[in-house]
Amino acid sequence: MKGIYSALLVSFDKDGNINEKGLREIIRHNIDVCKIDGLYVGGSTGENFMLSTDEKKRIFEIAMDEAKGQVKLIAQVGSVNLKEAVELAKFTTDLGYDAISAVTPFYYKFDFNEIKHYYETIINSVDNKLIIYSIPFLTGVNMSIEQFAELFENDKIIGVKFTAADFYLLERMRKAFPDKLIFAGFDEMMLPATVLGVDGAIGSTFNVNGIRARQIFEAAQKGDIETALEVQHVTNDLITDILNNGLYQTIKLILQEQGVDAGYCRQPMKEATEEMIEKAKEINKKYF
């Protein structure tokens, strides 16, 4: 399960419907061009939390079909609706996903006992493995190393997608849980995360920048920090330009420039303006 995983983008048409042809093209681009090890399906990058249960299921089906067993697949099934999370966990396990993942329950201020109950309910409903999706800056849920340890007592909870900038906590977790998978979740921090011993990374920009992501990861693992830093500098220049132009819209526009029907974002995300489109063309030309 280790390696470089793209947090899969989803193509929508102008009316917000899933564009199956475009989604399949994004999946093939990730596998054939970006050379990723796996796909993280149904996460923030997939605009998941704006989708119906049926739409989520269809995306999971398309990804499984189009990946053709060539890469590992992780299904993000987490939801503030626990019944939906369990339903999606069962659905994706039956489809054959290699693991499931679940974001910490958000919006309401759940205490840790409620969070633990949430994870145990999901993983105990299926014969599969679970990766915790920790993204405190969006969920407001910050868990301590002691709380992670309590969750990891369940052998079916095999790791965490660590989307945070707390490198002290990351280092403490690496030391405390040598047998658990830790995936870096911030693309712009891959080098320091790799030096601290993560097992891989899951990122939105890998949909276009997967090759550089692997270069950083492999160079840092070999101790070639100079090369890794050089590629991280270029990557972070790219990420800065993307963020300044609109994250998901710009990644999709770059893919469009590369011949992939990446489509539109789901409302209430805004449609790309002419200025954003022109800037994305410049970004594509500059970095690819």
Swiss-Prot record:
Gene3D superfamilies: Aldolase class I
Stretch forming the signal peptide: none
Domain of life from the UniProt record: Bacteria
Subcellular location: Cytoplasm
Pathway: Amino-sugar metabolism; N-acetylneuraminate degradation; D-fructose 6-phosphate from N-acetylneuraminate: step 1/5
Positions bound to aceneuramate: S44, T45, T163, G185, D187, E188, S204
InterPro entries: Aldolase_TIM, DapA-like, NanA, Schiff_base-form_aldolases_AS, Schiff_base-form_aldolases_CS
Top EC group: lyase
EC number annotated for this UniProt entry: 4.1.3.3
Active site annotation, chain numbering: Y133 (proton donor), K161 (schiff-base intermediate with substrate)
Gene Ontology BP annotations: carbohydrate metabolic process; N-acetylneuraminate catabolic process
Reaction equation(s) it catalyzes: aceneuramate = aldehydo-N-acetyl-D-mannosamine + pyruvate
GO molecular function: N-acetylneuraminate lyase activity
Gene Ontology cellular component list: cytosol
PROSITE patterns: DHDPS_1, DHDPS_2
Keywords, ordered alphabetically: Carbohydrate metabolism, Cytoplasm, Lyase, Schiff base
SMART domains reported for this sequence: DHDPS
Subunit composition and interactions: Homotetramer.
Alphabetized PANTHER family for the sequence: N-ACETYLNEURAMINATE LYASE
Family to which the UniProt record says this protein belongs: Belongs to the DapA family. NanA subfamily.
Function, as annotated: Catalyzes the reversible aldol cleavage of N-acetylneuraminic acid (sialic acid; Neu5Ac) to form pyruvate and N-acetylmannosamine (ManNAc) via a Schiff base intermediate.
Name of this chain's protein: N-acetylneuraminate lyase
Naturally occurring in which organism (per UniProt): Clostridium perfringens (strain SM101 / Type A)
